[in-house]
Amino acid sequence: MDVNTKDGKGRIPIHYATYSKQHEITQILILLQPGSEIDTVDNYGGTPFFYLLLKHESGQNKTLLDFFLR
């Protein structure tokens, strides 16, 4: 699986994983393997980090926030 393959909306799998509140942190961390383009902007101007902040309460998923901020 190429974690950087875009769909018709310009999104890569990590966009959907961070947008969904039903994700497992381990699934997201798997998608965040070396070479993952985590700053990919979709057709709507959103990055995976943007969707993570949009969909999750502050303080939730600190592990993911720490990963994106390093």
Curated annotation (Swiss-Prot):
ANK repeats lie at residues 9-43. Keywords: ANK repeat. This is Putative ankyrin repeat protein RC0502. It comes from Rickettsia conorii (strain ATCC VR-613 / Malish 7).
